């Protein structure tokens, strides 16, 4: 019997990616405090990609504890600019600060995914993308945030590449799915290997 697939996420974008791929799954948000997990890692000097892996694993493990006979997919994404790690902005002023810091420079997205079953990590994967934002004026940032509003608070970096955020960039290197926070091609390959989807 094929195990039930569960996405350990409340993200509508991650759900959309899995739905668009034709996967049959349930989505259940992980009951973890992400900041409580990542703060000690960051304080210890963990790299942003390592933090993403730990969070992806933690989300999948928590949901797996509630649905032990399922294959649980956890994912997370961190964003870094040099040694600085960015988190989702807390308000529109914070979003403006993020966009000002990213203006005219290249930053990195680190997207991690893990599969857990019965509390055991079966697989994990990390992918990276490099994004270069075009130079933005303070006035343009204000107009952009006025248009997108609270949506800017739902992603690290205060942009949503799948929407108006694409207008902020001049160069992107990396897989589209990695940028959206769920590396679909390696995930689908692993799900086929595990017999969870037809292949």
Curated annotation (Swiss-Prot):
Primary location recorded for the protein, binned into one broad class: cytoplasm
Keywords assigned by UniProt, alphabetized: Cytoplasm, Hydrolase, Nucleotide metabolism
SUPFAM superfamilies reported in the protein's UniProt record: ITPase-like (SSF52972)
The EC number(s) this enzyme carries: 3.6.1.-
Superkingdom as given in the UniProt entry: Bacteria
Parts of the chain that traverse the membrane: none
Catalytic activity: N(7)-methyl-GTP + H2O = N(7)-methyl-GMP + diphosphate + H(+)
Residues the UniProt record annotates as site (Important for substrate specificity): 13, 77, 162
GO cellular component terms attached to this protein's record: cytoplasm
BP GO terms, sorted: nucleotide metabolic process
Cofactor(s) the record lists: a divalent metal cation
GO molecular function: nucleoside triphosphate diphosphatase activity
Pfam families: Maf
Entry function: Nucleoside triphosphate pyrophosphatase that hydrolyzes 7-methyl-GTP (m(7)GTP). May have a dual role in cell division arrest and in preventing the incorporation of modified nucleotides into cellular nucleic acids.
Similarity comment: family membership: Belongs to the Maf family. YceF subfamily.
Name used for this protein in its record: 7-methyl-GTP pyrophosphatase
Source organism (scientific name): Rhizobium johnstonii (strain DSM 114642 / LMG 32736 / 3841) (Rhizobium leguminosarum bv. viciae)
Lineage of the species this protein comes from: Bacteria, Pseudomonadati, Pseudomonadota, Alphaproteobacteria, Hyphomicrobiales
């Amino acid at each position: 019997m094929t195990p039930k697939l569960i996405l350990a996420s409340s993200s509508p974008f991650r759900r959309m990616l899995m739905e668009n791929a034709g996967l049959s799954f349930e989505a259940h948000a992980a009951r973890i405090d992400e900041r409580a997990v990542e703060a000690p890692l960051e304080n210890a000097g963990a790299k942003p990609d390592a933090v993403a892996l730990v969070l992806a694993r933690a989300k999948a493990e928590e949901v797996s504890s509630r649905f032990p006979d399922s294959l649980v997919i956890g994912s997370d994404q961190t964003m870094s600019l040099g040694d600085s790690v960015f988190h989702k902005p807390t308000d529109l002023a914070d979003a403006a600060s993020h966009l000002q810091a990213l203006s005219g420079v290249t930053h990195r997205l680190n997207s991690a995914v893990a599969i857990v079953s019965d509390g055991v990590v079966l697989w994990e994967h990390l992918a990276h993308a490099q994004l270069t934002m075009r130079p933005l004026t303070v006035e343009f940032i204000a107009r952009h945030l006025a248009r997108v509003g609270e949506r800017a608070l739902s992603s690290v970096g205060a942009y949503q590449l799948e929407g108006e955020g694409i207008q902020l960039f001049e160069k992107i290197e990396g897989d589209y799915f990695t940028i959206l926070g769920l590396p679909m091609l390696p995930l689908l390959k692993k799900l086929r290997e595990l017999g969870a989807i037809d292949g």
